[in-house]
């Protein structure tokens, strides 16, 4: 929005030329989102407490979690508000990639909101019925996938980039739609599964978003994309501002979500952030790098799949409890130790993911 205003005022005030620079808008984006989150945090927490919107804790969960019962939840609303306002302020709103991310972010946020509302306000522990949750997730993902396919059909925007191989970029055709669907829905639910400890999901989300900011910048730059042997996608550069908005809003939320948490993001936050990360990965054609950088999310999801599969097939559990962060809690690890070690793993994986751009 402001970039349009800057274009109008440039002939009269040269200062507004600064807003043409992607790096300048990226810095303003992270600072704006961070400031909004820090400002909204106390207001949101107080409001949630007044409305008695508190976390529901399963009786079969770790005993250490019983103290979390009643902690304000649905704090993801302030994350989405901070990201959305920042995007509307600092991005080029004529860019279709920006609207693709916003559609998934707010659409999945709405699904998560209904789920949280039913759990916390209506006191329905099951929340939104699973089949309806997946229906709305699938509908949003397919709409975005079809739109992106129609927009970039048979171009670099629908190629599959394989890490470590510079000349392996097959054209996906209609398989692009299927891949996009699974990446968006899968990442959304993976982040949701990871959101089980204070700050556990938000920091890896921030790190992955920061990694994708670097990738989006390289993908949207003709010289660097050619140098790194990745597709040149001119619209991708604007995703740098989107990614930095996620980083800023996430860090602001972490201020209140760090152990011991004053607020939880709820499904309204985790489903939306995961969906946004998946969409960004698709747009910059780095779905496979997402598997590396988002390895913590993958690990959490696989632990649930393996646990359920093993119990149904063999009648035995592999882990003491799934997702895997609960396994380590039940082994006696203090919650902060689990959280920080998962953060460290995430940081290393993001660096490895970025290294794949050069190691080809």
UniProtKB/Swiss-Prot annotation:
Pfam families: Glycos_transf_4, MraY_sig1
Stored PROSITE patterns: MRAY_1, MRAY_2
GO BP annotations, alphabetical order: cell division; cell wall organization; peptidoglycan biosynthetic process; regulation of cell shape
Bilayer topology term: Multi-pass membrane protein
EC number: 2.7.8.13
GO CC, one annotated term: plasma membrane
Pathway assignment: Cell wall biogenesis; peptidoglycan biosynthesis
Keywords from the named record: Cell cycle, Cell division, Cell inner membrane, Cell membrane, Cell shape, Cell wall biogenesis/degradation, Magnesium, Membrane, Metal-binding, Peptidoglycan synthesis, Transferase, Transmembrane, Transmembrane helix
Keyword rRNA-binding: no
Cofactor(s), names only, from the UniProt record: Mg(2+)
Residues passing through the membrane, by range: 26-46, 70-90, 94-114, 132-152, 168-188, 199-219, 236-256, 263-283, 288-308, 338-358
Subcellular location: Cell inner membrane
Major location category of this protein: membrane
Coiled coil stretches, renumbered: none
Enzyme class: transferase
GO MF terms, alphabetically ordered: metal ion binding; phospho-N-acetylmuramoyl-pentapeptide-transferase activity; UDP-N-acetylmuramoyl-L-alanyl-D-glutamyl-meso-2,6-diaminopimelyl-D-alanyl-D-alanine:undecaprenyl-phosphate transferase activity
Catalysed reaction, written as an equation: UDP-N-acetyl-alpha-D-muramoyl-L-alanyl-gamma-D-glutamyl-meso-2,6-diaminopimeloyl-D-alanyl-D-alanine + di-trans,octa-cis-undecaprenyl phosphate = di-trans,octa-cis-undecaprenyl diphospho-N-acetyl-alpha-D-muramoyl-L-alanyl-D-glutamyl-meso-2,6-diaminopimeloyl-D-alanyl-D-alanine + UMP
Function text: Catalyzes the initial step of the lipid cycle reactions in the biosynthesis of the cell wall peptidoglycan: transfers peptidoglycan precursor phospho-MurNAc-pentapeptide from UDP-MurNAc-pentapeptide onto the lipid carrier undecaprenyl phosphate, yielding undecaprenyl-pyrophosphoryl-MurNAc-pentapeptide, known as lipid I.
Family per record: Belongs to the glycosyltransferase 4 family. MraY subfamily.
Name of the featured protein: Phospho-N-acetylmuramoyl-pentapeptide-transferase
Organism: Vibrio parahaemolyticus serotype O3:K6 (strain RIMD 2210633)
Lineage: Bacteria, Pseudomonadati, Pseudomonadota, Gammaproteobacteria, Vibrionales
């Amino acid at each position: 929005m402001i970039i349009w205003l800057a274009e109008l005022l440039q002939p009269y005030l040269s200062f507004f030329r600064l807003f043409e620079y992607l790096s300048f808008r990226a810095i303003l984006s992270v600072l704006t989102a961070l400031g909004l989150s820090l400002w909204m945090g106390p207001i949101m927490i107080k409001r949630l407490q007044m409305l008695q919107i508190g976390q529901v804790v399963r009786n079969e969960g770790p005993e250490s979690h019983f103290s979390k019962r009643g902690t304000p939840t649905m704090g993801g609303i302030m994350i989405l508000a901070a990201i959305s306002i920042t995007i509307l302020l600092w991005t080029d709103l004529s860019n279709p990639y920006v609207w693709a991310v916003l559609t998934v972010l707010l659409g999945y946020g709405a699904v998560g909101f209904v789920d949280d509302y039913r759990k916390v306000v209506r006191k329905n522990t099951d929340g939104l019925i699973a089949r309806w949750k997946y229906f709305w997730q699938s509908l949003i993902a397919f709409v975005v996938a079809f739109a992106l396919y129609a927009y970039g059909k048979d171009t670099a925007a629908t190629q599959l980039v394989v890490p470590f191989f510079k000349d392996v970029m097959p054209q996906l055709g209609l398989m692009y739609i299927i891949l996009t669907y699974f990446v968006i829905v899968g990442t959304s639910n993976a982040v949701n599964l990871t959101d089980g400890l204070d700050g556990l999901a938000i920091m890896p989300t921030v790190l992955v978003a920061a990694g994708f900011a670097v990738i989006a910048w390289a993908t949207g730059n003709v010289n660097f994309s050619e140098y790194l042997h990745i597709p040149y996608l001119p619209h991708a550069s604007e995703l740098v501002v989107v990614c930095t908005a996620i980083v800023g809003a996430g860090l602001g939320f972490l201020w209140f979500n760090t152990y011991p948490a004053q607020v939880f993001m709820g499904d309204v936050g985790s489903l939306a952030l995961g969906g946004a990360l998946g969409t960004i990965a698709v747009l910059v054609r780095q779905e496979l790098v997402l598997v590396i950088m988002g390895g913590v999310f993958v690990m959490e999801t696989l632990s649930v799949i393996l646990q359920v599969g093993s119990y149904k097939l063999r009648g035995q559990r592999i882990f003491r409890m799934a997702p895997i962060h609960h396994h380590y809690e039940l082994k006696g690890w203090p919650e902060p130790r689990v959280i920080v070690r998962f953060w460290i793993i995430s940081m290393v994986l993001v660096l490895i993911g970025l290294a794949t751009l050069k190691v080809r």
